[in-house]
Amino acid sequence: MADGWRDHIESAGPGRVRIRQHGRMLADAMMVAEPEMLGEGIDDRSPQQLVNTAEIPGIVGEAWAMADWHYGYGFPIGGVVATSTEYGDQGGGISPGGVGFDINCGVRLLSTGISQRGTDISKLVDLLSKHVPAGVSSKGGVRLNSAALDSILSGGAASAADMGLGLQEDLIGIESGGLMETEERAISDRARSRGGASLGTLGSGNHFLEIQVVDKVVDIKSAEAFGIYEGDVTVMIHSGSRGLGHQVCSDHVKEIESNYTERGGRWVSDRWGFDIADRQLACAPIYSKEGQAYMDSMRAAGNFAFANRSALTQRVREVFREGVGSDADIGVTYDVSHNIAKIEDHVIHGKNCTCAVHRKGATRAFSGDHPEMIGKFENVGQPVLVPGDMGRAS
């Protein structure tokens, strides 16, 4: 992977840098950055990873890196790439590396109905630390039998609510209603075993549960639509599909990579006619057997993640009832994924496109006129939740 991308950068307007198509790239790459941020001394691997993603067969538009881009598995974290479903005979590439191992890792913002004034935040923090399981293990999670796990994998947040792990009224505040449609849900026994006891657990790494206070409201119209006011106490949850999602990704990375061989420093699939720069970008045609198997399993893991954040929300409700009594009214302001691939319709460079949009460390940002934006989101669009890492006081 030659480090030649620096010879092809140009400003694309305030806060945007273009890496012009060169070499085997099939499209330009765009970074949310300023040119001076790409000088000598930065970690060159992330821009090179972005350049590599622009070689994925069927790419439409540009390969994008959001403002917090950094090095990841195959794709840079913050990477967004769309591939056409109409490319070739079976569609463009779908890459597990473009979603990542924590499938449907996402952020949920909760309103509480209480003000910072007069609230014992320290007491709430202590109670949350006691009642919300965190760390690598699944200790303290909800144990699910096989039938209950199947229900979660197929029904997502709604199934969790049916089990008392969340409320049906929460669903309108969750991306896609907390449900990704699946068919076979053919995930491995190993993945199932890793999910059987981890529902309602936070995990480790940069995952967190954080009590926040609304310091300042800038967009009054949107804030009022979301029920957000200065001085309000809110709670933010950052978690995903735990070990189940990690295993689903691992299983399909192995399966798809087995169709590639190294040839001249590149990775080639003669079966699919795909030629990529990095093994970690291994992708299958969207409508191939392997592509569909990954998409279906990814959606099932995505449903588990929605249910996991719902179960965590219910733990927050219980803690606030204990800590502040009946004054607390926990509601879901919004829940959005930042590790997912979805089939979506977009207009790209003036042309209608049905495409598989990979978002890795990046969220969608739909405006109020999008068909999914109903109720309180209809006129203002969805919130885009941008947290800091655990301990950085988002």
List PLM regions with ranges.
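Short, conserved catalytic or adaptor-binding loops enriched in Gly and charged residues
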Residues: 55-56
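Short, glycine/acidic-enriched loop or turn micro-motifs at the edges of active sites
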Residues: 70, 105, 241
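Domain-length cofactor-binding catalytic modules of enzymes
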Residues: 2-49, 59-62, 73-77, 85-96, ...
